[in-house]
Amino acid sequence: MAFTPFPPRQPTASARLPLTLMTLDDWALATITGADSEKYMQGQVTADVSQMTENQHLLAAHCDAKGKMWSNLRLFRDGDGFAWIERRSVREPQLTELKKYAVFSKVTIAPDDERVLLGVAGFQARAALANLFSELPSKEKQVVKEGATTLLWFEHPAERFLIVTDEATANMLTDKLRGEAELNNSQQWLALNIEAGFPVIDAANSGQFIPQATNLQALGGISFKKGCYTGQEMVARAKFRGANKRALWLLAGSASRLPEAGEDLELKMGENWRRTGTVLAAVKLEDGQVVVQVVMNNDMEPDSIFRVRDDANTLHIEPLPYSLEE
C-alpha cells in the first residue's frame, strides 16, 4: 500500500510557517543505476555531475537538442548511481527522453515509487528532526544518508529539509511529529519553492524554455566548463552571445483566481494592459495573498504592475533570495 498524502491546508509564507510535515505527492523520484551512470548523466544534463560529491545536491536541467528543458531535476548521488526529484507531471516524458540513448550504455533508468518524499519546514524544523536522526544536513554538508533515508538541506526561503525514505520510516516520522507539527500536502512545499525562486516545470511548460530563462545559472545548475550534453550549444549561445532575454520572477498580490501553468499575465502600460510572460506556478496563501512564479522579459521595471488576465486585482514584483548578476 502506498503512503497516503496528508490532507491539504492553505499554505503559509515561510516567515510565519509553524513546524510542518508535508507529503510531496506532486513531486516524483527517479533513478539511474549501473556502471555508466555518471558518464551517461554527464552527457544529458546541464550540471557537472562528475564533480558532485556524496554530500551535494544540485538543480540541473535536462534539455532537448534545442536547449529547451524537458524538466529540471533535483539531483543527488544514490547507491551506485544518481536519483533525482522532479514534478510528477513531467517524470514519464522526461524518462522517455532520457532513455533514448541508454541502449548503448550499462545503465538502468527507472521511476521509483517505493520510496516516499516528505518535506519538513517551519518553526524549529531542525530541532524537531534532531531527535529522530543522528546527523542532519547543513550548508556545509547538504546531503546526509542514514539507513534507508536520504536527507537534503535547503537554505531558502528558510531552512527546510527534504526526506527521501522508505514507507516504514515515513510512518515513524509521521507518528513522531504528528503531535507537534502541522501536516500538509505538497502545495505548501510548492509555495516555499516559489518563494525561494526555484523554477517549477510542470507538463504545460515542458519543452518551452532554455535553462537561463528560469534563472538556473544563478542557482548553480549550469556548468559552462563541462563536455558535451544534449542542448549544450544553445545553452552556451544564450550565455556567450547574450541570446537569453528572459528571467524567472516572483510576483505577489491578489487575484480572484489562480493563474494556471502555461497561462500569460497582463502588464500595465499607462492606461492599458498588455499580455506578458508565462506562468510556471501559483499558490494562494492562508492570508489571502497570491504568489506567482512567472517567466518574463529580464528587463522588467521593479515597480511594474501585473494582473491575472482581466482581473480587478493586481500583482507586484517581489525580490528573489539570489542575484541574477553574473
UniProtKB/Swiss-Prot annotation:
Cite the binding residues for folate: 27, 189
Question: What does this protein do, in the record's words?
Answer: Folate-binding protein involved in regulating the level of ATP-DnaA and in the modification of some tRNAs. It is probably a key factor in regulatory networks that act via tRNA modification, such as initiation of chromosomal replication.
Q: Which organism is it from?
A: Escherichia coli (strain SE11)
Its predominant location is cytoplasm
UniProt-listed Pfam families = GCV_T, YgfZ_barrel
| UniProt keywords, alphabetically | Cytoplasm, Folate-binding, tRNA processing
The source's superkingdom equals Bacteria
Q: GO cellular component terms?
A: cytoplasm
Query: Which residues are in coiled coils?
Result: none
* Xref: NCBIfam families: PRK09559.1, ygfZ_signature
Family named by the database record: Belongs to the tRNA-modifying YgfZ family.
Q: Which GO terms describe its molecular function?
A: folic acid binding
Q: Sorted alphabetically, which InterPro entries does this protein's record hold? A: GCV_T_N, GcvT/YgfZ_C, tRNA-modifying_YgfZ, YgfZ/GcvT, YgfZ/GcvT_CS, YgfZ_barrel
Give the GO biological process terms.
iron-sulfur cluster assembly; RNA modification; tRNA processing
Does the entry feature the keyword Cytoplasm, yes or no? yes
Tell me which Gene3D superfamilies the record gives. 2.40.30.160, 3.30.70.1630, Aminomethyltransferase beta-barrel domains (3.30.70.1400)
Name the UniProt record assigns to this protein: tRNA-modifying protein YgfZ
